[in-house]
Amino acid sequence: MRIICAMTAVACAAAMAGDVVLFDAATADVNSVRAQDGASFELKDGLLTVKTAPSDAYPGVCVSGKWDLSGCGRVEVEFVNGGIYGRYTLRLLNAGGVPAGKGSKIFKLPIRGEKHAVIGADFPPDLPELDAIVPQLKPVRVWAIPYLVWAPFPKPGESLDRRAPVGGVGTLDRSAVRQVAVYINKPLLPHTWSVRRIVAKAGDGAASARPVPAWAKMKPDQFFPFIDAYGQFKHREWPDKVHADADLARQRAKEEADLAAHPGPKGWDKWGGWADGPQLPKTGGFSTTKWNGKWWIVDPDGHLWWSHGPVRVTPSCATTPLDDHDHWFARLPAKGDPEAEFYSTRDKLLFPYYARWKKYRIYDFSAQNIARKYGTGWYETWSALAHRRLRSWGCNTIANSSDRDICLMDRTPYTDRYEIHSRPIAGHKGGWWDFCDPFDPSFRAEARQKTVEYRRQFEDPWCFGFFVDNEHHWGQADTLALSTLKSPADQPCKRVFRDRLKAKYGEIAKLNAQWKTSYTGWDEFLSVTTTPDPKAAKEDLEAFTVEIAEEYYRIIREELKRAAPGKLYLGCRWAGGAPLFTVKAAAKYCDVLSYNIYRRHLREFKLPDGIDKPILVGEFHFGALDRGPFCPGLILLKDQEERGRTYVDYVRSALEHPQFVGVHWHQFSDQATSGRFDGENMQVGWTDVCDTPYWETVRALREIGYDLYPTRAAGK
């Protein structure tokens, strides 16, 4: 990461004896602060106000100086007007601005929806053994490991998410700190936020007083292997952890009794719609309507329907790559072992991602454990159980990225997702995949081919709609047009852009005058891959970015509706938010707008002014570290009880919101403790890697799910 820092002559006077003030906006000189990675700032009225644009980097601010923090055990940042962004990063560095690792310490600072908050982070005790182990766990998500070691227990009524973590990455010589930076990690939207003070607090910090577990002091030869025969973290215990196949049998019997006692909500039709609610016209498929001021989906029987269910209903959630780290695992089956089949079971939707990451040796711990639990015919048994579980738990949806054969059992409505991989805009980078050129004929051809590949789902009345693509990197209002200009002369969208400009300006000289460029002709416009001054070309860049977005959505809709007029086009699942131009374009062509919204609730969410469309949450989750994997996902909570309470509140906030027509949890089962293709190893399932339900979550699902429709109808 590139760090550009301000120079300060000396550190400010400490606020309390022993405290070290690293930054105070009330006394700082405006010339002492510089931005990093495209951010801008204003130092005024005792606040350092920072503006950050969408970026693939780490925009923020940084201060340099000379500080001895050896007598300090905690660092606190005073935020004002924290904005909508949920997590900032505080980074302390020794000399040289080295990357993550030696010479730096990174703290994740959670703040969401706060007008004013002081967020602090404890320095952990020095553990050289753990520092030696953590780098060997890459690419597994390791930022939360300090929570397991020094878990900062909250006060009564205080969420762990609202307390600061201990430093998660890197080592630091506290006696020679030279730089302090506050920034956002690759923001997708513009943000404005302010910092008043950054203070290192005297004392040891609360983390130093907490007992350190034995495994955190192990040497590597003691720590490895750290994954047991069931795919669980070997060195910790928690309720319902599996130690033998007999534990699986006991859990199966326990759940069977629970399902028999809870067959599902009353007053639902076969689709999970509101049979006791109003009768609307039957269309034979799923549609949308606004009833009593709120958006709804309508099921094929003409009943109001609100989508509630999990993403990735598959027996292969805990598939993990083995490349170069067989020593992580206490047991992997030998060739010829009956369980060697689980080297080849796979999550079909995510397998292309493993290939893209060049992860070809994999093992499926989740399917292995399910086979041990249910025996011969395990796949068929588990598939039928998945439908039974969902209805019992108050759900009516199998959300996208789930097992196709389970969806096609026609017992639970489902949505699917496909991705278009045609010729990309060569100058575009970022996101899961490069953005495809909608003006290239291959785009429509690929969109049409997908409807052929998914023909069974398109013809299935239980499939209510499709997401197309996922979490595109849209950038700013001019990004797609700038990406077009960076592309070669034969890029179709670049030729279309040339034609639009030629029609508008006629002569290249007029374009040059407006853009402050020096093209010799329209042919050179095509061949040049440098970009103009964005301010001079702003109007044209933004207009063509809109045209690309509209062409993208238009073609997808046309091909989807050509194949199946009765299926809903559910958009592309924006990551948290989306720039205005793509929301407006999607509103023209999508039946439902979709966002992946990782927040604690949705009460503050709103569409841009002038847009009134139904919204579907494609992903959300919360995790805790009292069970299973050592990563809690994107929102960390204290424990499973708090996760259950927060789940109820999130879904209730969506039910009370007039535009949400459903929420989809990510994901049905925990990810592998040893990580998937990109290292994700999150405790975010409704079941763990051994197929054991998290009973606190099940109770929460039923609490809100069984009253889904009365809650939606009443609302606010």
Predicted regions and their residues:
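Substrate-binding cleft of secreted/luminal carbohydrate-active enzymes
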Residues: 461-465, 469-471, 635-686
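Glycoside hydrolase catalytic-domain groove-lining segments
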Residues: 543-558, 562-633, 648-652
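Short carbohydrate-recognition loop motifs
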Residues: 40-58
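Extracellular ligand-binding interfaces
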Residues: 52-167, 189-194
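Aromatic-rich peripheral "rim/lid" segments of glycoside hydrolase catalytic domains that contact
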Residues: 483-495, 666-716
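Active-site clefts of carbohydrate-active enzymes
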Residues: 362-370, 426-436, 528-542, 611-650, ...
